[in-house]
């Protein structure tokens, strides 16, 4: 029960943070969605150890676990645009598949590059 309440508080904190980032974007007229700005700011706060991972970890893990649930309204909403899907459906699916493939390949290559650099660093520090 304690973990549930802690997770609920963390989800509320993340929600408030997201709303705050949307407000910042609106007030400052920034051409970046509030959610993207929020991700960047959360990453920076975690990276520079201004906030601790434990402060948001349980809530973030729950949100990730339930991510599919958040796409259901979007998928249902698409059904209102059957005429557009009939005309551009194949193109949309092709773009989604290609962009997914590009993201997967680039993520894999970047991960391998980072792993190699870490291994080189580890080897260099153990040789010294």
Swiss-Prot record:
Membrane topology note: Multi-pass membrane protein
GO BP terms: cytolysis; killing of cells of another organism; programmed cell death
InterPro entries xref list: Holin-like_CidA, LrgA/CidA
Superkingdom of origin: Bacteria
GO CC list: plasma membrane
Cellular location(s): Cell membrane
Main subcellular location: membrane
Keyword annotations: Cell membrane, Cytolysis, Membrane, Transmembrane, Transmembrane helix
Segments traversing the membrane: 23-43, 58-78, 84-104
Family membership: Belongs to the CidA/LrgA family. CidA subfamily.
Function: Increases the activity of extracellular murein hydrolases possibly by mediating their export via hole formation. Inhibited by the antiholin-like proteins LrgAB. In an unstressed cell, the LrgAB products probably inhibit the function of the CidA protein. When a cell is stressed by the addition of antibiotics or by other factors in the environment, CidA possibly oligomerizes within the bacterial cell membrane, creating lesions that disrupt the proton motive force, which in turn results in loss of cell viability.
The protein's name: Holin-like protein CidA
């Amino acid at each position: 029960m304690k973990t549930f309440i802690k997770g609920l508080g963390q989800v509320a904190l993340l929600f408030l943070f997201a709303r705050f980032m949307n407000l910042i974007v609106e007030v400052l007229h920034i051409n970046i969605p509030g959610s993207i700005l929020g991700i960047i700011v959360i990453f920076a706060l975690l990276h520079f150890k201004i906030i601790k991972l434990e402060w948001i970890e349980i809530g973030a893990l729950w949100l990730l676990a339930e991510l599919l649930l958040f796409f259901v309204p979007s998928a249902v909403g698409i059904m209102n645009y059957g005429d557009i899907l009939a005309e551009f459906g194949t193109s949309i699916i092709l773009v989604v598949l290609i962009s997914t493939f590009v993201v997967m390949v680039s993520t894999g290559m970047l991960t391998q590059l980072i792993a190699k650099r870490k291994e080189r660093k580890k080897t260099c520090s153990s040789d010294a």
